[in-house]
Amino acid sequence: VMDGITALPRIHAAAPFARIVMASTLTHQGAAVTIRALSLGAADYIAKPDAGQIAGAEDYRRDLLVKIRGLGSSAKRTAYALAPRRLGQPLTATTAAPRKDLALGNKTLKAKPEALFIGSSTGGPAALGAVVASLVGKATVPVFITQHMPAMFTAILAEHMAKATGAKVVEAKDGMAAEAGSFYIAPGDFHMTVQRRAGRVFIVLDQSPPENFCRPAVDPLFRSAAAVYGERAFGVVLTGMGHDGREGARVLASKGGLILVQDEASSVVWGMPGAVATAGLACAIKPISEIGPTILNVLRGVNP
């Protein structure tokens, strides 16, 4: 009998544009299998309801329909966006032409960035793995990541990403001091923000209400980035469903910070990056293969 992990690469080999949703139990083992499936090209995942829970089954049905509709409505991508790969494996360039009908926001650095803030959702683990792999040993600032995931999954994601890339990737903890070159992933069910105290920047976790139906959400992270770092904050929005990150990006842009977004062709779902781009807040729109190099250039003080 073939399990899902074995089947994933074979499905993508036969149908490169297939969107696969992984059904997972909310356990440590289930989280580990799900992260592996996402790194192999699964587009998204959904938590299985507990046996005998009618309310849970109804939530499962609703969430599954939302994911299917979101993935199905996205334009057909190149096989590049979904091809099986190890977490942290570099990505090759897409051949799709960039959108020319979108107005870009501020493209001029006012100050060299002192911190990097990344938001992602559907398709995010594979995209994050590629970006982190390109930054490890080269990024000279702390990197804060909000990926839409439940508790336990984010810890497993941090572990897998650290092993795959060799980077210092950790699940963030409340009160943790930010260190240059380290990557902090917001824990599931907590918003992650930053705060400056006595000249140092610390991570703050809270369970205030979900934003954009998400906790953790990207908007509060970006708002805190604007408040703490201002024009020295650099935001990035990767593939994801919905529009989380757009309003936070608006606040960040108003303070002079730049926001880079992933392009439509290389995104599994161009919801979050598309929302920022169509709002005219993006400094540049790049395929995932160019996100890492662009980030490094901006961190060196080069305009995107």
How would you label these PLM feature ranges?
Residues V1-P304:
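Conserved acid/base catalytic micro-environments in cytosolic active-site loops
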